[in-house]
A protein has these predicted regions:
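Bacterial N-terminal signal peptides that target proteins for export
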Residues: 2-13
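Flexible, surface-exposed loop/linker segments and immediately adjacent secondary-structure boundaries
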Residues: 25-69, 73-160
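Bacterial N-terminal signal peptides
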Residues: 11-21
Length: 160
């Protein structure tokens, strides 16, 4: 007859679990609350660079501050941010979501897009309506302070 192994968790293990489990849950909540928008429409191929990894995206994919979106050839992406800003990217385009804040209750507004190459249609949302000075669109040649409601932009690839 074999002896049964009885496991009694140590106090250190229980203390570690009490600290770690709420921290892990808070981390998951913060990931959800850091979503700044989503991919509403996708045709062809597209990817997002998040950190150092490029991964394919699909319609409905969440977007985060710091993401870099790339469309393939052929490819097109429609993006909607949480303030109702809409951005359409044409084939062979690249855009970085550099800065974003939309917290009307705290009067926190920021929108900084870096359009790297390709074609874009941009329709402003609530950030421009509530705090026009908080929105900027950067291109390789200029920075645009957005005050209107619609922009169409074409950026050719830089030749060295």
């Amino acid at each position: 007859m074999e002896a049964a192994l009885i496991y009694k968790p140590s106090s250190a293990f229980l203390l570690a679990m009490l600290v770690c489990v709420p921290a892990m849950a808070a981390n998951e909540t913060s990931k959800t609350s850091d979503i700044i928008g989503h991919v509403q429409h996708l045709t062809g191929s597209a990817s997002v660079v998040r950190g150092s990894a490029a991964v394919p995206i699909a319609a409905g994919a969440p977007l985060y501050q710091g993401d870099v979106l790339r469309t393939g050839k052929p490819g097109a992406v429609g993006v909607v941010l949480t303030d109702a800003t809409t951005i359409s990217m044409g084939s062979g385009s690249e855009m970085a979501l550099n800065d974003y804040a939309f917290a009307p209750k705290d009067s926190k507004f920021a929108l900084a897009l870096k359009l790297i190459k390709g074609s874009f249609a941009y329709v402003t949302g609530q950030i421009v309506k509530l705090s026009p000075e908080s929105a900027q669109v950067h291109t390789p040649d200029a920075t645009i302070a957005v005050r209107g409601t619609k922009l169409l932009i074409q950026i050719d690839e830089m030749k060295e």
